[in-house]
Amino acid sequence: MFCAFCFLPGELITNRAVSLYTAVKATRIFCRKINLPALLFPTLTMNLKGNILISTTDFGGVYLLQDVVSVSLPVNERMMIKKNHFEPYNLTGNEKRICIVTGIHGDELEGQYVCYELIRKLSENRHLLSGIVDIYPSMNPLGMDSIKREMPIFDLDMNMIFPGSETGAVAEHIAAAIMNDIKGADICIDIHASNIFLREIPQVRISEETAPKLLPYAKMLNVDFIWVHSSVTVMEATLSHSLNKEGTPTLVAEMGVGMRITKSYGDQLLDGIFNLMAEMGIWTGETKKVSHPIVSTDGNVSFIYSDTSGIFMPAIKHWAGISKGDHIGDILDPLSGAVEQEIFAPCSGIVFTLREYPVVYEGSLLARILGGC
């Protein structure tokens, strides 16, 4: 690969005072001065500062792989949280910025496919980018590597320590660095999967307090369902709550099941993200028509719990319409061959949450029905 940086003055490369953007811009100007054909430098990559890499194309886009935070670990190792930063070549200073965040829980993988596809499409169509996109694929890399929901060394739920503290313990320091990096964005989407026990349809969850501001954005995301929670049930130490409190609009998107990737759900949310980016003036490419989600509050949701232990065998499909009295499933006893409990719908509606993991105990959540009783 031809590298245009080879022809740049040495001080441009070594002087850390020179901004990354200036370095990229200087490279482009130099290449144009010598009439270098665009095909000879489709990608220019160089380590200019620490772990930051720059890549550009002649289509007018720039992306940067950046460290958000880096902390020391035992045995001479480091944990690094990275982001992929996309911006248009000709910056005006008025660009809108969107942040896509996922992987706060190490066992939630649905967002990995979304990040991959989003980065792939942006890389191939940077000339259609008119705003700034920051993508954070793994906020809890240790949890993802060890297949654990929490941060394994600290045994902490990472989504329960925000906004963190720059001078606090390691986990708090990490949380504060993430907050500082995202803060100020025009919109942030925090992508989650369910846990390993439940399967969820693509949905956005927001609080009653933030609904007036966030609901218009949520309706653009091509989800099936928007759940407006009571403010009493909102956990204040989450990333989304902390960012919203700081003035950065943040949506929580949830879909699928833990430790799995549902491609159809990922594609659905991707269409919504590009639609939202287009509506905000960040993306100028074509977008697909999005669905109109059902909007509901806590009062419209019914919870179905198990009364006994055993193996749950559903008799309905996920996201299926049911009527009051319909057979939802059975709880079986494999040892005796008996049906311990037959479960019937207490009301009519749509099943938007369904038990995925078969083993249940008394009080286990089996389903949630949109409809209310």
Where are these regions (language model features)?
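Low-complexity proline/serine/threonine-rich segments in eukaryotic and viral proteins
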Residues: 23, 35-40
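Polybasic, lysine-rich low-complexity intrinsically disordered segments
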Residues: 29, 33-34
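Structured catalytic-domain cores with a bias toward divalent-metal coordination
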Residues: 10, 16-19, 26, 44-373
